[in-house]
Amino acid sequence: MDFSWTEEQKIWRRTVRDFAQKKIKPMVREIDTNKKIPENIIKDMARLGLLAPTVSKEYGGSEVDWTMACIAAEELGRADISLAIPVMYLVEAAWGYIFSRYGTHEMKETYLPKVTSGDAFIGIAVTEPEGGSDILGTAKTTAFKKGKNWVLNGEKMFISGVTESKQMGGIHLTLARTDPDAGHKGFSFFAVPLKHNHNVKTTLLEDMGRMGISTGGFAMGL
C-alpha cells in the first residue's frame, strides 16, 4: 500500500502553507491582542475553500476529503493555532460536515453557504458545566416538544465561537436529551442561533492561548 502524498495533496499543502505563512503568521500578535481573527483573513480563507471544507459543493463547500482537511489544519497550525483547531478543523470542518450530512435541506440552504463564505459561524455545544467527556452521565440539557416547536432547557460551557456566532450569526449544534429512558439513543442535536436570540444568555471565559476565537457558554430557558 502506498502512503505517499498524491500530487493534488502536495499542491494543496503548498498552497495552504504559502497562505498561512504570508497572510496569517504576520498577524498572530494582533490576533492574540485583539482576541479576534481579522475579517480579511476569514474572507481569504473562504476564497481558498478553507472554511467548512468538507461540506459539499452544493452548499458552497470545497468537498475535500478528510486527508485534505487535516493537511490544511496542519499548515494553518504552523502559523496560528486559533485558526487551525477551533475554526478550521474542529469547528468548521467537523461540525459543518455533520450538519451538511444530517441537517434538513432547508436549514442547510439557510446556513451553510454563509458559513463557507465566512459570513456566519457554525459551532458545537456539547460540554456542560459538570462534564464534557462523559456525556451520557453528566448531560442535563433537555428538549421537549411544545406544539410545532422544541423547548430547550440547560447550560453549555467551554464552547468555541460564542462571540463569533452572536455577532456574525450562524448556529451551534447543541446536544440535548429528548428521551431520558433511551440511554445514548435519547439525545438529539438542535441548531441553536445565538444572534438576536433573547431566550439564550451567553457568558465569556478568559483563555490561555488560542486567543483568536472566543470561548464561553450559554444558558437556555433557565
PLM regions and their residue ranges:
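Intrinsic disorder at enzyme termini
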Residues: 1-11
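C-terminal helix-coil-helix/basic helical segment that borders enzyme active sites and/or dimer interfaces
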Residues: 25-36
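Internal helix-loop-helix
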Residues: 47-118, 161-171, 182
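A short, Trp-centered hydrophobic/proline-enriched beta-strand micro-motif
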Residues: 118-127
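Active-site-adjacent elements of ketosynthase-type condensing enzymes
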Residues: 130-139
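Flexible, small-/acidic-enriched active-site or ligand-binding loops
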Residues: 138, 198-222
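A structural signal for short hydrophobic beta-strand segments in well-ordered beta-sheet cores
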Residues: 141-144
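A short core secondary-structure module
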Residues: 149, 153-204
